[in-house]
Amino acid sequence: MPQTIVLDFETFYSQSYGLKKYTTEHYIRDEQFQVIGFAYKVDDGETHWVTGTDRQITEALQGLDIPNAYLICHNMAFDGAILAWRYGIKPKYYLDTLSMARPVTGLTVGGSLAALAKKYLLDEKGTEVVNALGLRREDFPADQLARYGEYCKHDVDLTYGLYHVFKQWNPPKELYIQDLMIRMFTDPVLKLDKNVLVDHLFNVQDKKAKLMERIDATVGRDALMSNPKFAVVLQKLGVEPPMKISLRTNKEAYAFGKTDQEFKALADHHDPRVQAVVAARLGIKSTLEETRTESFIGIAERGSLPILLNYWGAHTGRASGGDKMNLQNLPRGGALRRSITVPDNHSLVAVDSAQIEARVVAWWAGQEDLVTDFRNNVDIYSSFASIVYGRTIDRKKNPNDKVEGFVGKTCILGLGYGMGPDKFKATLKIGMGGISVDMPLDEAQNTVKLYRAKYDKIAQIWKDAQAALAQMSKGFECELGVGIALRCTPEGVHLPNGTMVRYPNLRKNADGFEYDGRYGPVKIYGGKMVENIVQALARIVVFDQMAKIDIELRKCDNPEADRRYKVALTVHDEVVSVVPTTVASWCLNFMLEVMKVPPKWCSNLPVSCEGDVGNNYADAK
């Protein structure tokens, strides 16, 4: 293994300028940014503190052999971006102890250096940073700057210790994926089209203003912005406010979200006044499009588009959006997707793994008839819809079968985890892609029964998972699954790549089973456990394919010649690369080839994919 260098920067911050108010990207690129100093450790040697003028700090960093070293930091997105953007230095390999910790501690102590050090090193993180508020490098008294240096050195020592704690739980390929994701942020290649964004912002604000004009005189903005006040507005109109149980607090809360089925249904209320206030509420509360567009414009003015993904951001190992910018749910074909573009003479190549979760659940449960249909490229959605409606459905060739095809798709993608009739009915009502189906409850019940009868092995694995939970909660081990038998222990489910889906302190309660989450107990049952495992397995498949693609592209990457070959982004089950336009067709074919081959541990899993090439993210979808 090459030389390791542990590094930690201390930087200027104030009441108005810091990571609590700024994104990481904005903070580092802002004109107020200043490095106070940094600490470093080479291999297991002595830890050093460096401060001084900008030139002295730059020379000290350049004196370290970082380009040929494995760089270790805690929260690499911060320190790695400072190195890359401010000093033009990139290491041979990024090792981020925050990313390394998440698969182990994400549900318990979290990822802060202080919490991890206390639990795993039995050591305390210092607090000297608090005294640095508002002080630029030239403002520090000598003694305070020296104390700050000791504080920084201690952070480096803690990071070094945590690296040795967590490396045992991070297989080499997962470390590569962490490095890949860090480079999406520290070495960005995507750009933003400011003109597209400015036009879109005008349209969004104009639409919101017109919505407000409709109800300003009768309701007022304050009532729309406040959940309790808006509840009173509905009650005065004779409507009982819909409620739900908050996943975060586990307490009852108003169901006024854009995807809350009962609230969305009020937009079709027979009283026009109710329609108006609900539409206006959705408009004024749905400021995500507006604020995200404004954020994109700011990034466009500062430079390229860094993609910060939280490695293992979800319980099942999937990534989540970071830096207050989630690209996981951009509207298809919308202006925000269209604004994401590439450097001159380059193209964007996007390949999406097809129905990966539905394929994995069928394979893992041993549902051979469904696996065979996937392998033979049968239109599964139309096939199952034909059973539901008692006639031949062909959603691809018959435009009149569009709704029925949507129902079939919802069944295949939604019923594999034990979804009941009520939720199935609500899911159809919420709709997707402009289609919404108001299925009677008795029809929803029959459809769920049809699915469970036809795909009985999938229904059986929910029961097997429930039995596994009982064994695990008693401290026993067992195996679960047909396509691959996974080892289940009291700690969780062991995955084929050496990671785990963890269930900390799994136990039986009066209602079933629960485990410790970040915000309190989390309910778990057979169908949910199957969903967790299938998502984790699907994630391994796609991320392993992404790593294979990236390994090949890195061989050709040449930033100095402005010829980039790079995996730039991953969204759900999609991999997005940027390559010179002259090789875009080759890259598409290569990515399609890679993503049609499963890993060795699931060599008989039928995987498929589709992709395209474009000048922007919308065109490549």
Regions flagged by a language model, labelled:
Residues 1-10, 15-17, 33, 39, ...:
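Conserved "right-hand" nucleotidyltransferase catalytic core of DNA-directed polymerases
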Residues 7, 73-74, 95-98, 342-356, ...:
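Conserved catalytic palm subdomain of right-hand nucleotidyl-transferase polymerases, strongest
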Residues 33-40, 44-59, 63-168, 178-180, ...:
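Active-site-proximal helix-loop-helix substrate-binding element of RNase H-like nuclease domains
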Residues 77-89, 102-104, 231-238, 354-368, ...:
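Short active-site loop/helix that positions an aromatic residue
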Residues 166-178, 541-575:
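Active-site palm subdomain of RNA-directed nucleic acid polymerases
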Residues 240, 302, 311, 390-558, ...:
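Conserved catalytic core of nucleic-acid polymerases
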Residues 308-395:
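Function-dense linear segments that define catalytic or interfacial modules
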Residues 587-595:
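Short amphipathic alpha-helices in soluble, non-transmembrane regions
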